A protein has these predicted regions:
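Conserved AMP-binding/adenylate-forming core of the ANL superfamily
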Residues: 3-4, 22-66, 70-74, 91-96, ...
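Conserved pre-ATP/AMP-binding loop-to-beta segment of ANL
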Residues: 4, 19-20, 140, 151-172, ...
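Conserved structural elements of the adenylate-forming
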Residues: 37-46, 164, 168, 183-204, ...
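Conserved AMP-binding/adenylation subdomain of ANL enzymes
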Residues: 191-208, 215-256, 270
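Gly/Ser/Thr-rich phosphate-binding loop
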Residues: 229, 254-258, 268-336, 347
Length: 349
């Protein structure tokens, strides 16, 4: 696939070239093809225009890792809104801080999810300033293949964005003080690291990559872009229970696993409980992000899961992914080693 300037252009081109390719699945048995993702995003985008969302509207969204969330993310990219994905575990202090700092115009929430009333939180924040609330209801698990999303008439949609260089994504990291640190990204910066990263691990349409982490992390958009670029299928899990989720993931026969130390600890514990037979027999590589992977953990993953090691990419929020560690093999390496990704335009010294 040739390069695209905008996130929406990537979605459109994939849907045109590979309409029936499965790009997303979840643990409820639902799937979305490239064409279904495009169509659902356009319909949702049309519905969101009725809530006053359009080009340049600042939208903070706090949604779990579901098909609906991926569609909302793409719908906002279609509209050219400025989207600010935030972690579902954030509460009044963090969410209040970022919505005030960004002067958020629309806040999208999942309703009551995992026992917490996000609408009540949103209303308490909206009482302090002018901010509209949009509900994407996640209070009940899916009962069938239908998406829990609003739908609208696509004829009302504005033209899609044409520039991939406008800052339309704002991600927050914890930083080094108590206040979250916001980072502005463009479509091109979100997509750049994914394109290089998948070349590094050789992702293809034969790959199945489970996503048990919050897709409101920049890795969510980056992995979706990677899937659209390569045909790699993403399987979404809205929660991660270290006792049960590794076995649920195993049922999808993943070829890739990620993404951070707690997940790998859970995968290895599940493998030990499973016995000598590989729990993940199709697994060929592991990818990490969020925080550096220690050589010791890489060694344990090699020995327990039978893969060459872990390709580690960190600081994705602060800047596009520009380098990943080599997949560690052989003796434990002290310190860190990185390979700059091709076509990123970064020099090291």
């Amino acid at each position: 696939m040739t390069a695209t300037d905008t996130f929406w252009e990537l979605v459109e081109r994939t849907a045109a070239d590979h309409p029936d390719r499965l790009v997303l699945a979840d643990d409820f048995g639902r799937t979305l093809t490239a064409a279904e993702l495009r169509d659902a995003a356009e319909s949702t985008a049309a519905a969101l225009t009725a809530d006053g969302i359009g080009p340049g509207t600042v939208v903070t969204w706090q949604l779990p890792t579901t098909l609906e969330t991926m569609v909302v993310m793409v719908a906002l990219a279609r509209l050219g809104a400025v989207q600010n994905p935030v972690l579902p575990i954030w509460r009044e202090a963090e969410l209040g801080f970022v919505t005030r700092q960004l002067d958020t115009e629309v806040l999208i929430v999942p309703g009551t999810w995992r026992g917490y009333d996000h609408v009540a939180l949103a209303k308490s924040l909206a009482a302090e300033r002018d901010m509209r609330i949009v509900l994407i209801d996640h209070s009940v698990d899916p009962a069938g293949p239908a998406l829990r999303l609003p739908a609208g008439e696509t004829s009302v949609l504005p033209p899609p964005p044409t520039s991939g260089d406008a800052a339309r994504w704002i991600y927050y990291s914890s930083g080094t003080t108590a206040a979250p640190k916001g980072v502005r990204h463009t479509d091109r910066s979100v997509m750049a690291g994914s394109a290089g990263g998948v070349r590094m691990i050789g992702a293809s349409s034969d790959d199945v990559n489970p996503i048990p982490f919050p897709v409101s992390h920049i890795g969510g958009a980056a992995m979706l872009a990677a899937g659209l670029l390569t045909g790699m299928r993403l399987v979404l899990f809205d929660t991660f229970d270290p006792e049960t989720t590794p076995f649920a993931i195993a049922r999808h026969r993943p070829t890739l696993l990620g993404t951070a130390t707690p997940f790998y600890v859970a995968y290895m514990a599940a493998q030990r409980r499973h016995g000598q037979r590989p729990l993940f027999p199709a697994l060929r590589a592991c990818v990490a992000g969020g925080a550096p992977i220690t050589p010791e953990l890489g060694r344990r993953v090699r020995e327990t899961l039978g893969v060459p090691g872990i390709a580690d990419a960190v600081r994705a929020t602060s800047a596009p992914v520009v380098g990943v560690s080599p997949i560690i093999g052989g003796a434990v390496v002290r310190g860190m080693a990185d390979h700059c990704l091709p076509a990123i335009g970064v020099e090291t010294s």
